[in-house]
């Protein structure tokens, strides 16, 4: 039973919890929005297909959202939770919309590589493989504001992974970028 509970937790399939104010069987929202957050969420939603590319300068999408087959390796596939965007030396990640920096993490396996997460009401944008950060947790950011430099990856390419979520639901970023 403990193993089963742990698997449900990892897979995000735990049943919703209840409180005294909540009737049994009524799921709690993942994020409680203030009036300002609701307005921001609505504004973010209305910009679907028109958000700026989250990288400065020329770019190339090198890996798309969803299942991707690895070139040269038969039957090997990777599930990409975002898009991988290659830029040039000194290119920067930039905020795709107004929001608040909700978290900053150092990548556990790549020293000096950071992940920046920005909350836009119910929506979250995440920017992976950054260095020389220009923002701090809790800071408000504006659309197109620089977040940090994109770090060279192990191949020497300046590649950033960009992800979008609505609460816990993963979204295809290519459907949101204009």
Q: Model regions: which residues?
A:
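Extracytoplasmic/periplasmic cell wall- or extracellular glycan-interacting regions that localize
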Residues: 1-98, 103, 108-111, 117-119, ...
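A residue-level detector for short acidic-glycine micro-motifs
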Residues: 63, 87, 103, 129-132, ...
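Short hydrophobic beta/alpha edge segments that flank linear recognition/processing sites
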Residues: 85, 114-116, 142-155
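A structural signal for short beta-strand/turn segments enriched in small hydrophobics and glycine
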Residues: 93, 99-101, 138-150
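Short histidine-centered loop motifs in beta-beta connectors
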Residues: 104, 120-140, 144
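Hydrophobic alpha-helix feature that most strongly marks membrane-spanning transmembrane helices
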Residues: 106, 135, 146-155, 178
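A beta-hairpin/wing motif
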Residues: 157-164
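Short proline/glycine- and basic residue-enriched helix-capping loop/turn segments at helix->loop/beta transitions
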Residues: 167
């Amino acid at each position: 039973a403990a193993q089963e509970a742990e698997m449900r937790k990892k897979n995000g399939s735990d049943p919703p919890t209840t409180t005294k104010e909540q009737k049994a069987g009524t799921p709690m929202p993942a994020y409680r929005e203030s009036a300002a957050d609701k307005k921001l969420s609505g504004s973010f939603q209305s910009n679907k297909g028109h958000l700026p590319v989250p990288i400065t300068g020329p770019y190339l999408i090198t890996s798309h959202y969803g299942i991707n087959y690895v070139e040269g390796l038969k039957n090997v596939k990777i599930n990409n939770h975002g898009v991988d965007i290659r830029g040039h030396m000194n290119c920067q990640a930039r905020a795709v919309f107004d929001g608040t920096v909700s978290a900053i993490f150092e990548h556990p396996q790549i020293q000096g590589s950071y992940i920046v997460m920005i909350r836009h009401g119910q929506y979250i944008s995440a920017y992976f493989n950054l260095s020389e950060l220009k923002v701090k947790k809790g800071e408000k950011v504006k659309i197109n504001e620089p977040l940090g430099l994109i770090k060279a990856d192990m191949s020497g390419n300046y590649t950033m992974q960009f992800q979008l979520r609505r609460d816990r639901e993963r979204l295809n970023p290519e459907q949101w970028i204009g």
